[in-house]
């Protein structure tokens, strides 16, 4: 799939810079392979609502972030999760765990904009799940707020909707929230959310 031309932090760039970079990568794809890919992977997994629209307008059908999770039929095609498997995160024990991981299906995650200005950091996070998820009250969520991974406080608004209390700002380039739910058979359901911290606040 396409991963941009420069592999720079495009999410912080002007629209014209993003479009020029993607257009160049598509020209190279077409020149060497005779066609363009339907798949796009955001550089560093970073995207904004604006970046998503650009990718849609270029005709890509699927786009991947870098938030962990399992793809299922309910996921936004332009915010697909992926587990990194590489020289740092590629041990066979971890791989065996990942292939047995199940999706944690949700209707909506708020805020929809994952590109955070300083005034929106920390974000007010709300997750609305589908009605048929068993034992949802046993879910656990963790975040790297304040640049330190910790167990996050969650509060249920109703049986299917919860808030994740992020009390400290995300520090650095990315903020992450991971939620997991253990099934009776020992399998885990997993949901990851990634926020991008705006370069200029």
Regions found by a protein language model. Give the residues of each.
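Metal-dependent polysaccharide deacetylase catalytic core of the NodB/CE4 family, i.e.
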Residues: 1-51, 61, 74-81
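Histidine- and/or cysteine-centered catalytic micro-motif in compact active-site loops
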Residues: 5, 68, 130
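Long, contiguous hydrophobic alpha-helical segments, chiefly transmembrane helices and signal peptides
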Residues: 40-43, 63-65, 85, 125-127
């Amino acid at each position: 799939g396409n991963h941009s031309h420069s592999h720079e932090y495009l999410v912080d760039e002007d629209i014209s810079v993003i479009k020029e970079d993607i257009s160049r990568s598509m020209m190279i794809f077409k020149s060497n392979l005779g066609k363009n890919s339907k798949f796009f992977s955001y550089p560093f997994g970073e995207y904004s609502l604006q970046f998503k629209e650009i990718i849609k307008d270029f005709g890509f059908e699927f786009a991947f972030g870098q938030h962990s999770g399992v793809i299922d039929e309910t996921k936004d095609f332009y915010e697909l999760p992926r587990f990194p498997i590489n020289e740092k995160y590629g041990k066979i024990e971890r791989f065996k765990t990942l292939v047995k991981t199940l999706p944690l299906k949700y209707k909506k995650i708020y805020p929809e904009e994952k590109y955070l200005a300083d005034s929106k950091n920390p974000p007010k996070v709300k997750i609305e799940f589908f009605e048929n998820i068993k034992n949802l009250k046993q879910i656990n969520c963790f975040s790297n707020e304040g640049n330190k991974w910790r167990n996050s406080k969650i509060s249920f608004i109703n049986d299917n909707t919860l808030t994740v209390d992020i009390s400290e700002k995300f520090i650095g380039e990315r903020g992450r929230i991971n939620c997991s739910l253990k099934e009776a058979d020992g399998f885990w359901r997993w949901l990851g959310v990634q926020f991008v911290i705006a370069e200029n606040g």
